[in-house]
Amino acid sequence: MISMNISSNFDQNISRFHEILDVQKNFDIVYHTLTIADKKACLYFIDGFTKDEILLRLMQDFASVKPDSFPSSAHDFAKQYVHYGETTVETDDKNIFTQLLSGLSCLLIDGYDRAILIDCRTYPARGVSEPEKDKVLRGSRDGFVETMIFNTALIRRRIRDCLLYTSPSPRDRTRS
């Protein structure tokens, strides 16, 4: 991945994020397009790492922003309208992707040449263990026994790489 800074061109930033994160292949990388005070915005996060209640509150707060009181910088926007969790304003997309894959949410807003990183994460609280019903005779005895979202979050917690693709598809057992 070539490191470059975020630009103030929203569409260019979004196409770069979609290309690097490959949101079409990764079912656990979620993005929501929003409108904040007549400006286009996009919120990226990893499903299974974020607290839904905080994201809902953030989106409600974003809906209340008026065009005439819209801040001129990403720093000011973060101070005035992001009241939940810690925030960081970042320009280098390599750092942004590392933080995003570590569980932070990333907000891109049209006209800002910086991304707002919001820490509203929660980590899965279980290690990988042997499944009770599907014992194997040989090989690894590690298994995933929760939902696919939870299991993927357990993997992403350890492997923070844009090249880790996750796409749900049935394999050898049922194909259904």
Regions found by a protein language model. Name each.
Residues 165-176:
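Single conserved hydrophobic/aromatic residue that forms the stacking wall/gate
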Residues 26, 163-164:
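Active-site phosphate-binding and catalytic loops of NTP-dependent enzymes
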Residues 129, 133-138, 142-146, 150-153, ...:
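Glycine- and Gly-Pro-enriched alpha-helical subdomains that act as flexible
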Residues 1-115, 122-133, 137:
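N-terminal pre-transmembrane cytosolic regions of membrane proteins
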Residues 82-90, 145-154:
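Noncatalytic linker/hinge segments flanking ATPase motor cores
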Residues 99, 103, 154, 158-162:
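Mid-sequence acidic-hydrophobic segments that form the walls
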